């Protein structure tokens, strides 16, 4: 009983290869349905994101190997010219489980501890379940992976601390002003970086966000998306600087959008009430001399990257704890897999003894009263339970390797003269 994982990710292939081999949700469903309907797989799931496309397959025949699945996906995407098997990784048995646990707990992510991947794994499982491609093995594997991710999030700090510039800026603002909901925020620039910063602010309960941008319609669109509907014309935002506790700049410009003189006047109007300026521009948007002003907190990208580097160091320090959780769950999953392998023998063993019991009781059915027969049946049930306890316990006992399972199964089948499974079914 095998679970194979093959795929490409940020470790094995450049982005152009990952893009070429990725699957949309429609393609995902079509691909795994084809694997099942063609008799190649009992179960199948595909995780497909910008950083990875990975297959998780329970093969239905020995010919379905890792190499076979690589070629099958390449052929499905008609990508033989661009994609080669060397771009793929392969995992088998518990290696597959370990890999999915590492992916789900975000230690295999491009950015260590990036929590978005768990939702993507859950989406992959949902898609597989919707087309009836997730059976007992994948269902147990995925739910164990979800459990691993939950334990990692609650028992370690692998996902704590900002690791993007925009989020680091917001996290810093929250450390200085603990309650962002009470602060008035000006966002200068509604591009990708500014948009991310605004959305992170919104997630931290900041609601009083005013947006200005050279193209007013872009500012209005972002304001509407956030639900603030507060904008300022780019030509006049400097007239209102004194009203804001936090100013975020994220524009493409060769000239400073805020000068030391302008912010000196602003601080006078505010009576030195503290202001945070988060300069997310490259080149810098803000005159660095502003940092010399009293009660003015200025942080640029370099300062924020220093925070990010420290956070990544802290996350890396949590890896031993994460790996310990994964190891514990991997052992439990492996033991569960082993019980599946011995279950047919346990069922056959119980069935044989029940059949013997029923034949022997049938001989006395008309020789004793119903009460006596019931007592005999109760007694024989107890005897059978005790007789079968040790061989069943031996079959279920933890083992060092999967290779020991056939020897145990064969021993029990030979001792109790059980037919081979393929002769019975």
Curated annotation (Swiss-Prot):
Homodimer. The keyword Hydrolase does not apply. The active site is at residue 50. InterPro entries: 4pyrrol_synth_GluRdtase, 4pyrrol_synth_GluRdtase_dimer, 4pyrrol_synth_GluRdtase_N, GluRdtase_CS, GluRdtase_dimer_dom_sf, GluRdtase_N_sf, NAD(P)-bd_dom_sf, Shikm_DH/Glu-tRNA_Rdtase. This is Glutamyl-tRNA reductase. The lineage of its organism: Bacteria, Pseudomonadati, Chlorobiota, Chlorobiia, Chlorobiales. SUPFAM superfamilies: Glutamyl tRNA-reductase catalytic, N-terminal domain (SSF69742), Glutamyl tRNA-reductase dimerization domain (SSF69075), NAD(P)-binding Rossmann-fold domains (SSF51735). During catalysis, the active site Cys acts as a nucleophile attacking the alpha-carbonyl group of tRNA-bound glutamate with the formation of a thioester intermediate between enzyme and glutamate, and the concomitant release of tRNA(Glu). The thioester intermediate is finally reduced by direct hydride transfer from NADPH, to form the product GSA. HAMAP family: Glu_tRNA_reductase. Coiled coil: none annotated. PANTHER family: GLUTAMYL-TRNA REDUCTASE. PROSITE patterns: GLUTR (PS00747). It catalyses: (S)-4-amino-5-oxopentanoate + tRNA(Glu) + NADP(+) = L-glutamyl-tRNA(Glu) + NADPH + H(+). Catalyzes the NADPH-dependent reduction of glutamyl-tRNA(Glu) to glutamate 1-semialdehyde (GSA). It comes from Chlorobium phaeobacteroides (strain DSM 266 / SMG 266 / 2430). The record marks 99 as: Important for activity. Keywords: Chlorophyll biosynthesis, NADP, Oxidoreductase, Porphyrin biosynthesis. GO terms for molecular function: glutamyl-tRNA reductase activity; NADP binding. Pathway: Porphyrin-containing compound metabolism; protoporphyrin-IX biosynthesis; 5-aminolevulinate from L-glutamyl-tRNA(Glu): step 1/2; Porphyrin-containing compound metabolism; chlorophyll biosynthesis. Pfam families: GlutR_dimer, GlutR_N, Shikimate_DH. GO terms for biological process: chlorophyll biosynthetic process; protoporphyrinogen IX biosynthetic process from glutamate.
